[in-house]
Amino acid sequence: MGFRPTALRLATELGITGTVCNTGGRVTLTATGEGAALTAFEKRLCRAFSIYQYEENELPFQPFSGFTITHSRGARGLPFLPPDLATCPDCQRELLDPKNRRYRHPFITCIHCGPRYTVMEALPYDRERTVMGRFPLCPDCRAEYTTPADRRCHAQTIACPHCGPQLTMDIETAAQLLRQGEVVAVKGIGGYHLCASAANPPAVAKIRQIKHRGQKPFAVLFRNIEEVRQYCRVSQAEEKLLLSAARPIVLLHSKRPLPTEITCGSDRVGAFLPCNPLQILLLEAISPLVVTSANISGAPMCTDDTAVQQFGVPVLGHDRPILTPIDDSVLQVTEGNPAFMRRARGYVPLAVEPVSYTHLTLPTK
């Protein structure tokens, strides 16, 4: 993510002139400069991003006064839609830094993280075509958005406590309710979750009753990878998935018993880590939590701020709309390789990568 500001920064560094713009889910880049600089520019861009496909063409010389990000335009062809990405390490550090202006701001993002797919209204992917267009940038955020060297340059979902979305309940209030054994509905990236303390079996049983859910284990949200290791055995491959920008639920072998109300007697646990700032802040206050989609089993995940009231539990919500519902992804590692049990948040709407296979010739009768 953040291809255009990264291209701008590299071009400025290498003395390259030209333009870069969104074209309906793709990027068109025109660059002019010395041969060695252009080669370095291309290599560094390719190293910085997972580029699925690109075409390179030599054009007649055009003089440019500098390198600029130009206005997005539509284009034909199959577009590239960006997935939602978990809070990056830089944003998490700022979130927990009392000296930072975004300290404890539950909607902190940058070019490397935050909601994309779930907040997009249309392509090309620009702020005015996301739900964040409803939140005009304050002068400080506008300065970051327009500064090439800033990691929030052209980051479409940025905001701050002064100009961004607002919570409907204080996080500490929600944490206190959870400590008291309450079930709380929490608005996530792709929908609402029903949450309860993993240390409170009656609260977990209440979630099962609300959802009309039979003997099917619940996933557990842990504060960090160290806490996951207290309860589960974690291989290198599993840890890589847990810490990835997709933040999926990963099926792990347990090593410390969890209540049967969570596991239903299984020796495996669906574990995952916080994928957004609101979860990070909540887990700082109480952890681990049972976290499951707010729905009646078999029904779609709830995204509506009014419909969530049907569950009859306190609600920790906010005024940033969810346009596209999406559930948490679920994977397990089999023989060292990740296998999807549910491909969703963090991976959708990316194309499924090709899998190698062998053609078998079946004998004829």
Language-model features: where?
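Intrinsically disordered, low-complexity, mixed-charge
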Residues: 1-157, 161-165
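General beta-strand structural signal in soluble alpha/beta enzymes
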Residues: 20, 184-187, 194, 220-222, ...
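A phosphate-binding glycine/aspartate-rich beta-alpha loop in the early core of alpha/beta enzymes
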Residues: 58, 183, 191-254, 324
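Flexible, glycine/proline-enriched loop segments at strand-loop-helix junctions
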Residues: 78-79, 92-100, 128, 144-150, ...
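N- or domain-start disorder-to-order transition segments that initiate the globular core
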Residues: 166-179
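Divalent-metal (Mg2+/Mn2+/Ca2+)-assisted nucleotide/phosphate chemistry catalytic cores
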Residues: 240-299
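Internal gly/pro-rich beta-alpha loop/helix module
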Residues: 285-357
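Conserved small/polar residues in nucleotide/adenosyl-binding loops
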Residues: 358-364
